[in-house]
Amino acid sequence: MDHRLLEIVACPVCHGKLYYNKEQQELICKPDGLAYPVQDGIPVLLEVEARALTLEESHP
């Protein structure tokens, strides 16, 4: 995923900063506990497509 894009995208729920998890190919919103998928380098920033983070993922 293009890191320039990461600088301008925001969580669609809280409008907060997203963190890229390269291993899982996801954008993470820590405050909301959501992970948005990145498919073919394109973030899918739809709340219905996001998965809830596990407790371990939320508080490492």
Curated annotation (Swiss-Prot):
Cellular component per GO, a single term: cytosol
Q: Which InterPro entries match?
A: Trm112-like (IPR005651)
What domain of life does the UniProt record list for this protein's source? Bacteria
Gene3D superfamilies according to UniProt: 2.20.25.10
What SUPFAM superfamilies does the record tag this protein with?
Trm112p-like
Q: Which residues form the signal peptide?
A: none
Concerning HAMAP family, the annotation shows: UPF0434 (MF_01187)
Instruction: Spell out the family assignment given in the record's similarity comment.
Output: Belongs to the UPF0434 family.
Name-wise, this protein is UPF0434 protein ETA_21370
Q: Which organism is it from?
A: Erwinia tasmaniensis (strain DSM 17950 / CFBP 7177 / CIP 109463 / NCPPB 4357 / Et1/99)
